[in-house]
Amino acid sequence: MDIIQVIVLSIIEGITEFLPISSTGHLIIVSNLMNLAQNAVQTNFEITIQLASIFAVCYEYREKFYNNLELWKKIIISFIPVGIMGLLFHKIVYQLFTVQIVATAFIVGGIIFLIVEKYYKEKEHNIKDLKDISYKQSLLIGIAQAFSLIPGTSRSGATIVGGMLCNLNRKTATEFSFLGALPVMLAASLFDIVKHHSELGSGDISNLVVGFIVSFFMALITIRLFLKYIEKYNFVPFGIYRILFGVILLMFFVR
């Protein structure tokens, strides 16, 4: 990869990881457009920029994490369903990384967002703080998160929808989605590291450093701006974007 490709992919990861539009789906499409082979170098790079996004969440929520055992329990509970499903079906999941499936997941996810928003009443969703989320709700959100194993679904999208259906307001559902990303992304990164341990070290170190820095700051900016956005607006634009993006993929990339 050249430096332009490194920066572009890092920006995409940083922006899309925490928006309900699937970072994996965007990285797959852009990598295909750049004709980048899925080899050891590419795998190491993707692990690096994903870890950068994890660090961005840790930095942004460092005060909430400190000495907050209850929050950690809820995050771990939400991880259990996707963790189990990932271990049981990871071989099948890797076979789903096709443009057709990504595009279909984009469209279906977009439709779900539009339906949920149509019937959503903010004033009736009385859970407005992370501390008020129950263990049962954490588990239900985790079950919704398991659907994100399907490429193109969006982990953040699945957890946000799950949170809204569990009586969380938009901002709280979004924040819990950010925090719930930590064990999922960390587990996915560790799984890739173990799987490709013999290939670690492949690639240009300077590319990895640049990718990490760009992804970290883009993720941090996205988290802050997205929370401000969702305090005033809804997820309808993201639903429409997902549908349009999925249709474009089917029209131009599926033969």
From Swiss-Prot:
Ubl conjugation found in the keyword field: no
TM segment ranges: 1-21, 75-95, 96-116, 174-194, 203-223, 234-254
Chief place where the protein resides: membrane
Domain of life: Archaea
Keyword Metal-binding: no
Annotated S-S bridges: none
Subcellular location: Cell membrane
HAMAP family: Undec_diphosphatase (MF_01006)
The protein's name in its UniProt record: Undecaprenyl-diphosphatase
Species this chain originates from: Methanococcus aeolicus (strain ATCC BAA-1280 / DSM 17508 / OCM 812 / Nankai-3)
